[in-house]
Amino acid sequence: MALPGADTFPFRDDRPGGLREGWEDGGVTGTLVLAGTPIGDVQDAPPRLAAELAGADVVAAEDTRRLRRLTQALGVAPAGRVVSYFEGNESARTPELVEELAGGARVLLVTDAGMPSVSDPGYRLVAAAVERGVRVTAVPGPSAVLTALALSGLPVDRFCFEGFLPRKAGERLTRLREVAEERRTLVYFEAPHRLDDTLAAMAEVFGTDRRAAVCRELTKTYEEVRRGGLGELAEWAGEGVRGEITVVVEGAPDKGPEEVGAEELVRRVRVREEAGERRKEAIAAVAAQVGVPKREVFDAVVAAKNAAKDEAKNAGI
């Protein structure tokens, strides 16, 4: 099933010829459709979703069992073939689906909840389809990221989605330190049994007073949004939390150059070094962030290093 006007859909390319060989000249006529699914309340399903499920030649689902429950709730039966498409089989399944698309099939991709590709399977298939010259379109739907941002009460004019943090404590701290000075609002997904440890780590890196919102079970019966400082929220989460979690964290405060002394410059360089940056790059990044010459940051780091050596020498170490 082709979309009206699909034969004129432009796909620009920098290679000679201007347009990659594709459906415009009859080479590729298939279409990949990314469809959003409810994050909780099935009534939030996009109206077009049922039509796409009924009309697609192939439905690729993150979990075919959850897809079955969704189609039953929507009162629709997929007319095409249903296949699984999840993290464990993405590599093998992607070429198969691209071949179907190249042959003219309309392939619908859905995940368990929300939009495909957003911390869910999808982007590999999109990239492969684009490379092959396949038309890619979407049926926009619910998003836990945008819903949590809207409910958080924090600035949402600029934000950064960080997905899930690493499970290991050390790796989690490293990842958080990488964005310790990020001024945009941060959004994370987290499992309920790790929430208290994650919030405690955030409080350690960002500060206990940094504002945040924990959004739980969005659009479901027991939806809850808990707002407060990271320290307060970490203590609350220690009592046990259930459900699907999205955490929204306020960005770092905007500190003017006059507030950043030598000690703070050195601290920021160390944070970046601990996150894996080389000293030269860390110094350049801090200088650009604060708005001071790189030489000023370099001198502060050298002075701190020399002071530490003198202190160790005087202590007889």
Residue ranges of predicted features:
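Glycine-rich, flexible N-terminal cofactor/catalytic loop recognition
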Residues: 2-87
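Short active-site oxyanion
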Residues: 53-59, 133-137, 185-186
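A short, charged helix-loop
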Residues: 32, 159-181, 251
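Conserved helicase motor
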Residues: 83-91, 165-168
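Short glycine-cluster motifs
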Residues: 102-166
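A contiguous loop/helix-start segment that scaffolds small-molecule binding in enzyme catalytic cores
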Residues: 3, 7-14, 18, 22-25, ...
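General beta-strand structural signal in soluble alpha/beta enzymes
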Residues: 61, 138-141, 188, 214
